[in-house]
Every structure is written in C-alpha cells, then in structure tokens.
C-alpha cells in the first residue's frame, strides 16, 4: 500500500489501529487494506 488512512510508510497499519474517529464512534484498520472501513472520505 502507498496511500490511505491505514497505510504508513508503504506498510499496512496493524489491525485495530484507529483510522477515523468522531465523538460518537471510531473505525479501525483491518490490517488487510489501506482503506478505513466506513471511512467517509
């Protein structure tokens, strides 16, 4: 992976890493994709 909220320095962030957070909920990286599940961007 090269870009995305779940990518850092061309590597996937670990599963469970917060990729998007609001005052009501958080979404987490899966460790298998550079995209954030349900990320609104």
Swiss-Prot record:
Keyword check for Glycoprotein: no
GO biological process: angiogenesis; cell differentiation
Superkingdom, taxonomy of origin: Eukaryota
Site (Indirectly maintains the active conformation of the loop): 22
Motif Cell attachment site in this chain: 21-23
Similarity field: Belongs to the disintegrin family. Short disintegrin subfamily.
Membrane-spanning intervals of the chain: none
Residue ranges of domain Disintegrin in the record: 1-41
Subunit text: Monomer.
Principal location class: secreted
Transport as UniProt keyword: no
Protein name listed in UniProt: Disintegrin obtustatin
The protein's role, per its UniProt record: Is a potent and selective inhibitor of alpha-1/beta-1 (ITGA1/ITGB1) integrin. It blocks the adhesion of alpha-1/beta-1-expressing K562 cells to immobilized collagens IV and I with IC(50) of 2 and 0.5 nM, respectively. Potently inhibits angiogenesis in chicken and in mouse model and reduces tumor development by half. Is 25-fold less potent than viperistatin.
A cellular-component GO term for this protein: extracellular region
Species: Macrovipera lebetina obtusa
Single GO term (MF): toxin activity
Cellular localization per UniProt: Secreted
